Amino acid sequence: MSKKRLYEIAKELGKESKEIVQRAKELGLDVKSHSSSVEAATADKIVASFASAKKAVAGTSEAKAKPSTEPIKTEATPSKPAKDKTEQATNKPSPSPASSPKPVEEASAKAPASKQEQAQGTAAPKVTRPQSRNFKAEREARAKEQAERRKQQGQQRPQGNRNDRNDRRNNQNDRNDRNSQNRNDRRNRQEQGNQHRNQGQSQYNQQRQSFNQGPKIDFKARAAALKAEQNAEYARSSEERFKQAKANKEALREQNKRKEQAKLEDLFVEVESPKPTAKAPATPAPTAQDPAVDTRRKKQARPDKERDNFDHEEDGPRKQQKNRSSQNQVRNQKNSNWNNNKKTKKGKNNRNNNATPKPVTERKFHELPTEFEYTDGMTVAEIAKRIKREPAEIVKKLFMMGVMATQNQSLDGDTIELLMVDYGIEAKKKVEVDAADIERFFVEEGYINEDALEERPPVVTIMGHVDHGKTTLLDTLRNSRVATGEAGGITQHIGAYQIVEGGKKITFLDTPGHAAFTSMRARGASVTDITILVVAADDGVMPQTIEAINHSKAANVPIIVAINKIDKPGANPERVIGELAEHGVMSTAWGGDSEFVEISAKFNQNIDELLETVLLVAEIQELKADPTVRAIGTVIEARLDKGKGAVATLLVQQGTLNVQDPIVVGNTFGRVRAMTNDLGRRVKVAGPSTPVSITGLNETPMAGDHFAVYEDEKAARAAGEERAKRALLKQRQATHRVSLENLFDTLKAGEVKSVNVIIKADVQGSVEALAASLQKIEVEGVKVTIVHSAVGAINESDVTLAEASNAVIIGFNVRPTPQARQQAESDSVEIRLHSIIYKVIEEVEDAMKGMLDPEYQEKIIGEALIRETFKVSKVGTIGGFMVISGKVTRDSKVRVIRDGVVIYDGQLASLKHFKDDVKEVTNGREGGLMIEGYNDIQVDDTIEAYIMEEIKK
């Protein structure tokens, strides 16, 4: 079924849409606006409701109104007057009631009254309009009527008559409503510029004049008169406004004068009275002479809208420029008066006008502190905040003390102390703690809690000469085969191990005995509690033995002497005891303080006695530690692992080290990612005297560095970065600069050749040992320059650096990566790989000796005597000679000796035997020779032949 919208129903019934919407709501329909749609049946109900209402109205008006079929006289019925802007509508004759079913109202509206009748005020009789109209029937009737009219006009219309065409155009729409009038007006305005149209319009006006009974109205003159009247009225109102504004201004001026006079009088009263009382200024009462000023802004009387349509004409208000300027002045003055005198409102600008004044709060008095802890560089504002005083007060005190300062100026310590003395406060300087200083944890007395101290395992370092059995002894103690795993059978880095004896733990550190590992032995002695000095019974005291004794004495560590290899036939323990006594190590049997134990590490002889001695000495020392504090300790060894990164072997000395602890190790920092003990097992906690290997550091630390655990990772990072920055600055400051004092040494050093070396090793201790050993090599005229040293495999960056610095890469217990090996082959960079340290030293020493310039000595190989000379043009002088001793060779150098004096020293140009070129002429034979660059050869000259031979070193 089809639907209809409410506005379509309204159009059919000739009703307004809102009436249809209202009627639909009365019928109980859910509609919202005239655009709502309803079913066809519902639409019929709405139409039927209006039809029933129409019948009810028609029944009531039948007795009062005449029947609609009776004709109505419309000659005396004038239409409504039209507006001035629109033209007069065409007066058309009314059709008869029989010929047209149109309503009476439409027929009467088609005969508009003339202007004369409107002026005379002729009233038209009232016509009763029906409540509803059948628009469809009306449209059909109009269509028929228009068709008949067109037919009649077409028969009577002459050819080429423009006036008839205009009449037909005007008569096409007989509805004299507002839309047709506006359309005709627009069309007429568009054709005003056409002269032919103007003539036709004049004819049309003349024809229209015949229909209108009365004189023609001049609309232009009427509009001009209306505009003149409006301008005059506007001028009169402007003059009145100007006079009113002037009067208001004078009244305001007088009022301000009276207010100023009242203020002056109050001021004089306050000066004369000793204790003035607060009074509100009296406002003078308005008198009869002072008229009340109406400061309210009046609404401007805007001229009629009709005069705006004639602003383009010459007689408009634009002509009155002088009056307009005066009007603007009056308007501005009035606006200013209105703004000055307007009533106060509750708003942002006047929110406190009527508010009661708050009582003045007294400042709280703060007592001065008894003590003040200060730092150098504190500002006046900071001091004022600390002692709860105003900065201006402190600035004043400083000014009285002779110190000119502002609140943002820094003060030194002496000035702050003087200021506190003036206030009666005891000043103390704050001791600033360097967060990057790890050493403070080892020396601070308050760091360790004396009540929480517990017994800890002793740390024992095994020291001695190379190949005296240190690692074999430790191997026996651990029941393992550590010695067989070392390259060359010697220990080349510190090993940290822990064993259990009698229910008690003992931590052992195995140090290298080779001369190159002096720094390692010193590092081991600094962290140990007891030193076991291993001496072979057949070798006795050796250089590294003496060095170990000195390290132990420097660290004030007790020494236990283990005389090893007593199972050998040539063992002599008594000789060893005597030799040690010469170096200050006395046995307890001889009145000393060192314990001596004769052992055989190979056959496990007297090992238990040695361990009992260690525990006894440790018990005497009363070794204790606090496991409750954050862990501190020392780096035993460090290396760079390909899969794990930086790996450091730490010895915990105080506290407890846990996994995930933020830690600072030397100049590096990080978080403990994982911990493993000496057996390779992962642990989460490491107590005092426990050696562990950790990962998680950002770089590889140096062996011997201290470490400390911080409260959080942020503090650890800040401390580590600060330590790295300080180390770099210290390294830069250590660079020597050329001065007048060392200029000669610098020039002399430039003549010395150098061997550039890049060292890569498996652990940090080996790097240090190699660097120290290579720098100790003494070869006259050659020195070793270590370009770079690090831990880890040889990589591409090492090869690139070696190529740029012309260096040799030495790898100790490491191997180059495949990419580094290929790059080294293409760049011709030499890589030497070793696993035994003394072989590295020998090889570098040979290379240094090979870099020296060879030394040569002169060797005379023969003499010849000139017997004849021949001068050949373009060749030179040829000397015929005879060898009197030795031989003369082609590549030998010669000297020309005349009367025992060397005349010339040079090289042979040619050597011949008769006409043949020969390489040498032996003793007793003759030949000819020429000397390069020399032709003054004479008879009886002696030719001495010699060569330069290299001297072997």
Curated annotation (Swiss-Prot):
Binding residue positions for GTP: 464-471, 510-514, 564-567
Q: Region Disordered: start and end of each range?
A: 53-368
Q: What Gene3D superfamilies is this protein classified in?
A: 1.10.10.2480, P-loop containing nucleotide triphosphate hydrolases (3.40.50.300), Translation factors (2.40.30.10), Translation initiation factor IF- 2, domain 3 (3.40.50.10050)
Alphabetically, the GO molecular function entries are:
GTP binding; GTPase activity; translation initiation factor activity
Where is the protein situated, by its record's location annotation? Cytoplasm
Q: What is the lineage of its organism?
A: Bacteria, Bacillati, Bacillota, Bacilli, Lactobacillales
Q: Which organism's genome codes for this protein?
A: Streptococcus gordonii (strain Challis / ATCC 35105 / BCRC 15272 / CH1 / DL1 / V288)
- Bias-annotated ranges (Basic and acidic residues): 135-151, 162-190, 236-266, 301-318
Identify the stretch(es) annotated as G4.
564-567
- In this chain the tr-type G domain maps to 455-622
Please state what the protein is called.
Translation initiation factor IF-2
- Biased region (Low complexity) positions are 191-214, 274-288, 332-341
Q: Which GO terms describe its cellular component?
A: cytosol
Which parts of the sequence are annotated with region: G3?
A: 510-513
Which domain of life does the protein's organism represent? Answer: Bacteria
Q: Which family does it belong to?
A: Belongs to the TRAFAC class translation factor GTPase superfamily. Classic translation factor GTPase family. IF-2 subfamily.
Gene that this sequence comes from: infB
